[in-house]
């Protein structure tokens, strides 16, 4: 394959001739690898290709790249790269073909398309790997080739996951090719029959999912894949959800770092608080010890003074022989006073001790400090697995159930024409018992309002968009007036093929697409039976005579 060479510049930028854009030059292998590793250290859930594309968009600036991944704007950058690749891919595919080869090479082109897509994908992988090995952008098509490879991989994965979608797409392609030489009705009928077959296979898968509830999730996963009309809308909704999920995961990593920082700060604060408490306790202990030393010194001083006074009194008792009576009385009174203060000596020995309320302090220490636990306000979403199967399987079952009586009712007039008289009489009795008011209205043919009501009702039933009113038509035609002989003497017998054609649209309605693919032809058949009003009047005159 020929590659377009890009103009290289020594200023660190590349001018792309194809897209007319200025791209940043990659640099050496070591610099690019260091930048990729720096971005990956902060954003670990991104691939090397995505990091390279975002680095290329921000001129190999690591800070802007990390900021783009953290804020979620990197997905917009990647989307821009993929859009350029899609435009180039469309240019490659649009090649003029002669009209004679278009009808003959339709299946060959459908087969060779994935082969042509796989060849550039393999060559593009080589160019990407060459970018990593050589360390610089060798080609201006490397980014576009990456987007094309991603697109082909996504298309192949979608075709593997949704074979029904692939079948419908191939049928659409063949229909578009056949439009040149064949009439427009055949591809439409082909697509209609293919869609009916697809819906039958879906109904079979739904019945299997009802019988086996264990495989219900997998069946729902296959049935939830829509056709190509709604696939783009669903993909855009999924893209928004993926962006939100990506932002949430990036913020979770940031919150994890915040939690670690908060834990470290709290532990540091706790250690600081207990260190202050320990220093306060030690200071208090030192103060109490100093206080005890003072108490001890005071008590010893008091006791020493008491000891000295006791020694003085003893000396005075030794010289009491030489004292006068008055001195003896004073000495006796001093000894008595000294002895009477002995209880204070005992109190002094008891008071000189340490007392404290340890239990209260322990309780206050136990309640000291609080740690706030994280509130788990997260809740699990209630699954809608009971609603999804009903919404998926309800319309098809309801349409089959509602179309089955409608398919059987319009064939009643043709069948009653061919039935024998006893069967018609029994049908008339049952219908007259079901609808007494209508039978009473038919007895009096002179009532013009009744005839007008019947005419309006019959015209309503001729409308194929109102299939629910065919039941009343069948009951009118099974009545006694319509089962009589003169009513249908002037009407030619209807061929069985016409009756089959009348019942075909309604029987095909069970598949869900027959009413759309084929026009409904019951209008002329009902108009043939409506204008015959004279036999009723002639029969009434014959009855009166």
UniProtKB/Swiss-Prot annotation:
Biased composition, class Basic residues, residue ranges: 87-96
Start-end of Polar residues biased regions: 108-126, 455-464
Low complexity bias (residue ranges): 97-107, 391-413
SUPFAM superfamilies: UBA-like
Keyword NADP (UniProt): no
Main location: cytoplasm
Similarity comment text for this entry: Belongs to the SPATS2 family.
Record's protein name: Spermatogenesis-associated serine-rich protein 2
Source species: Mus musculus
Gene expressing this chain: Spats2
């Amino acid at each position: 394959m020929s590659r377009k060479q890009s103009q290289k510049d020594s200023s660190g930028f590349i001018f792309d001739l194809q897209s007319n854009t200025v791209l940043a030059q990659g640099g050496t292998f070591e610099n690019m690898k260091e930048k990729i590793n720096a971005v990956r250290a902060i954003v670990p859930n991104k691939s090397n290709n995505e990091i390279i594309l975002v680095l290329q968009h921000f001129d190999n600036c690591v800070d802007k790249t990390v900021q783009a991944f953290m804020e979620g704007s990197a997905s917009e950058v990647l989307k821009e790269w993929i859009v350029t690749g899609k435009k180039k891919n469309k240019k490659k595919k649009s090649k003029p073909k002669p009209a004679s080869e278009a009808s003959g090479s339709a299946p060959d082109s459908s087969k060779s398309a994935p082969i042509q897509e796989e060849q550039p994908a393999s060559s593009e992988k080589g160019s990407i790997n060459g970018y990593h090995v050589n360390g610089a952008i060798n080609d201006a098509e490397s980014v576009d080739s990456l987007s094309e490879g991603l697109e082909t991989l996504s298309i192949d994965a979608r075709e593997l996951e949704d074979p029904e979608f692939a079948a419908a797409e191939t049928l659409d392609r063949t229909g578009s090719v056949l439009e040149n030489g064949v009439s427009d009705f055949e591809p439409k009928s082909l697509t209609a029959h293919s869609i009916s077959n697809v819906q039958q296979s879906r109904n079979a898968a739904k019945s299997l999912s009802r019988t086996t509830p264990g495989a219900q999730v997998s069946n729902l996963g296959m049935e939830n894949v829509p056709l190509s009309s709604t696939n783009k809308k669903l993909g855009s909704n999924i893209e928004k959800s993926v962006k939100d999920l990506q932002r949430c995961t990036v913020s979770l990593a940031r919150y994890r770092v915040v939690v670690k920082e908060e834990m470290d700060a709290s532990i540091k604060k706790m250690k600081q608080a207990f260190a202050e408490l320990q220093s306060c306790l030690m200071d208090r202990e030192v103060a109490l010890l100093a206080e005890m030393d003072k108490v001890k010194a005071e008590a010893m001083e008091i006791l020493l003074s008491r000891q000295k006074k006791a020694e003085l009194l003893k000396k005075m008792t030794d010289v009491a022989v030489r004292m006068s009576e008055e001195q003896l009385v004073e000495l006796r009174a001093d000894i008595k006073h000294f002895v009477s203060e002995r209880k204070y000596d005992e109190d002094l020995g008891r008071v000189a001790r340490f007392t404290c309320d340890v239990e209260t302090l322990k309780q206050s220490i136990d309640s000291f400090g609080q740690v706030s636990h994280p509130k788990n306000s997260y809740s699990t979403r209630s699954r809608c697995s009971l609603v999804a199967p009903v919404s998926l399987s309800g319309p098809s079952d309801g349409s089959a159930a509602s179309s089955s009586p409608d398919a059987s009712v319009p064939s009643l007039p043709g069948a009653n024409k061919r039935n024998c008289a006893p069967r018609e009489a029994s049908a008339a009795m049952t219908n007259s018992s079901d609808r007494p008011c209508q039978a009473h209205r038919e007895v009096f043919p002179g009532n013009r309002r009744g005839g007008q009501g019947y005419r309006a009702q019959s015209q309503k039933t001729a409308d194929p968009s109102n299939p629910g009113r065919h039941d009343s038509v069948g009951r009118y035609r099974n009545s006694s007036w319509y089962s009589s002989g003169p009513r249908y003497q002037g009407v030619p017998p209807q061929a069985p093929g016409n009756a089959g054609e009348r019942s075909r649209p309604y029987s095909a309605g069970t598949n869900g697409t027959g009413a759309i693919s084929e026009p409904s032809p019951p209008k002329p058949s009902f108009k043939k039976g409506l204008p015959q009003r004279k036999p009723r009047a002639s029969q009434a005159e014959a009855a009166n005579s």
